[in-house]
């Protein structure tokens, strides 16, 4: 292979990674971040890298099928991508996430670096011990090998993927169908906005009181010099009075600080609730447009697929079946059985199934992310810190999710492509285990999500009016 081909293939690989990384940053800043959230440069870079390497895995699958680039270039791209992605997931992200949590908690930089290094060692030990409880490749070649690391990441990733898919299978009809959309009264939003303004004004007033109390303490402490010029009895009386005043002022400041923190937390929750109500009002108006009606029809179609997937996964878990033909392949096969137009059923259904499943994956991840954001904002008192934690957590999930997707998609590919992916990931990996593991967790996640969303819908139904 000449230098021209090397430069061309290297340019294609580099340009695709740069493009995917830019797309990841655009998605993070335009879709996930909100206007009021602080953004850290290094966190965005890590997210962009994980996004690029993760999406490149799917791109490499397409490169194998089309094919694009030479066989040697694709092989090197596979190994480079997996090496960089595993390095980020197993070493860089856990270390930096722990370091950032410590720094946000006020720990000094040197101590945070040391504690994060100790945490990484504990994480690696737990990561290794996890393999004892699941089917893993032979450990003869060591722990830090591609099959060992991919297998352990696959267990976590398939679990996360099954939870997301189970949640998405239930949340998708709830989010897309106008049947579950409720009209938001503008007066409810105005009431919350008045409460927010009152909370912020009260918070500002109490902060002013804190400043005045601190100035009073400084005045009392400054009067100590004047007491020295007085008689002994007056100095004793003045010292006692000053001590009582300082104690009372300190108690007032502590009480005001606690009230300010509570008011800031209340203001943050009110702000998020107002934002969510505004979004729900926009969604209700959108559902009345022609695009909203089209989305409603799409929601019914995807809901049928979700119900089918839940039933087939339940059947697989109960009867321990290896899996059956997906509905897309079944529909195309029945159609072409009566109308033979010379199309390869397996290849066509493979592409359509991946597109259909991909839509469910994207929607479920976005829905799950929204709930993760709510959780972190509810339990954290530092808004920017919680946002950073969510992005790093999402980066970890995303990388494991995409590696696990390759483990599961491999079974849907033709034998010639399946062999290539098997060689790249490691021939000792127990691929069938991941399909059984996915079905079991998917069923549990779907039924649990059904219970939670039903409870949420029931609790809110009395406060909102259905759309005509």
Swiss-Prot record:
Q: Provide the membrane topology annotation.
A: Multi-pass membrane protein
Cellular compartment(s) = Cell membrane; Endoplasmic reticulum membrane
Keyword Cytoplasm recorded:
no
Gene Ontology terms, cellular component aspect?
Answer: endoplasmic reticulum membrane; plasma membrane
Segments crossing the lipid bilayer:
7-27, 45-65, 82-102, 112-132, 153-173, 297-319, 345-365, 389-409, 437-457
**What's any GO biological process attached to this entry?**
response to abscisic acid
Question: What stretch or stretches form a coiled coil here?
Answer: 243-279
Asked if the record carries the keyword Ribonucleoprotein, the reply is: no
Q: What GO molecular functions are on record for this protein?
A: abscisic acid binding; GTPase binding
Covalent lipid sites (N-myristoyl glycine): 2
Query: Which UniProt keyword terms apply here?
Result: Cell membrane, Coiled coil, Endoplasmic reticulum, Lipoprotein, Membrane, Myristate, Stress response, Transmembrane, Transmembrane helix
Question: Which InterPro entries does this entry report, sorted A to Z?
Answer: ABA_GPCR_dom, Golgi_pH-regulator_cons_dom, GPHR/GTG
Q: What is its main location?
A: membrane
Q: Explain the purpose of this protein.
A: Involved in chilling tolerance.
The entry assigns this protein to a family as follows: Belongs to the Golgi pH regulator (TC 1.A.38) family.
Its UniProt miscellaneous note says:
This polymorphism is associated with divergence in chilling tolerance of rice cultivars. COLD1 confers adaptation of japonica rice to chilling and originated from the Chinese wild populations of Oryza rufipogon.
Q: What interactions and quaternary structure are annotated?
A: Interacts with GPA1/RGA1.
Protein name, as recorded: GPCR-type G protein COLD1
Specify the species: Oryza sativa subsp. indica (Rice)
């Amino acid at each position: 292979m000449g230098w021209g081909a090397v430069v061309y293939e290297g340019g294609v690989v580099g340009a695709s990674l740069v493009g995917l990384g830019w797309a990841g940053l655009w998605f993070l800043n335009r879709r996930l971040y909100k206007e009021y959230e602080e953004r850290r440069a290094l966190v965005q870079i890590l997210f962009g890298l994980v996004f690029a390497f993760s999406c490149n895995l799917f791109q490499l699958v397409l490169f194998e099928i089309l094919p694009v680039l030479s066989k040697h270039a694709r092989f090197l791209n596979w190994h480079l991508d997996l090496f960089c992605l595993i390095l980020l997931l197993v070493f860089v992200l856990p270390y930096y996430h722990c370091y950032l949590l410590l720094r946000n908690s006020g720990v000094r930089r040197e101590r945070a670096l040391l504690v994060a290094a100790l945490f990484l060692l504990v994480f690696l030990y737990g990561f290794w011990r996890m393999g004892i409880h699941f089917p893993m490749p032979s450990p003869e070649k060591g722990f830090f090998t591609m099959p060992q690391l991919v297998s352990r990441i696959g267990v976590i990733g398939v679990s996360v993927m099954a939870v997301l898919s189970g949640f998405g299978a239930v949340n998708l009809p709830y989010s897309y169908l106008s049947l579950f959309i409720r009209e938001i009264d503008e007066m409810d939003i105005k009431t919350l906005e008045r409460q927010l303004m009152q909370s912020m004004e009260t918070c500002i007033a109490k902060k002013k009181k804190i400043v005045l109390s601190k100035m009073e303490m400084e005045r009392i402490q400054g009067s100590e010099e004047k007491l020295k010029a007085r008689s002994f009895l007056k100095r004793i009386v003045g010292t006692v009075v000053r001590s009582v005043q300082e104690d009372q002022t300190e108690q007032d400041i502590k009480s005001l600080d606690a009230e300010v923190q509570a008011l800031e937390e209340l203001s943050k929750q009110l702000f998020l609730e107002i934002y969510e109500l505004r979004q729900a009002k926009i969604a209700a108006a959108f559902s009345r447009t022609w695009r909203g009606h089209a989305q409603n029809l799409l929601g019914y179609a995807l809901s049928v697929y979700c119900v089918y997937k839940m039933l087939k996964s339940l059947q697989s878990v109960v009867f321990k079946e290896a899996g059956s033909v997906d509905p897309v392949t079944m529909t195309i096969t029945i159609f072409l059985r009566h109308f033979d137009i010379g199309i390869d059923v397996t290849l066509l259904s493979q592409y359509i199934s991946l597109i259909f499943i991909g839509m469910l994956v994207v929607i479920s991840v976005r829905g799950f992310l929204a709930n993760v954001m709510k959780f972190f904002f509810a339990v954290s008192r530092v808004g920017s810190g919680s946002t950073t934690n969510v992005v790093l957590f999402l980066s970890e999930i995303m990388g494991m999710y995409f590696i696990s997707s390759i483990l599961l998609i491999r079974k849907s590919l033709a034998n010639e492509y399946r062999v290539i992916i098997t060689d790249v990931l490691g021939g000792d990996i127990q691929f069938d285990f991941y399909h059984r593991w996915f079905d079991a967790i998917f069923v549990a996640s779907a039924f649990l999500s059904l219970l939670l969303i039903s409870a949420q819908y029931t609790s809110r139904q009395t406060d909102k009016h259905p759309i005509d």
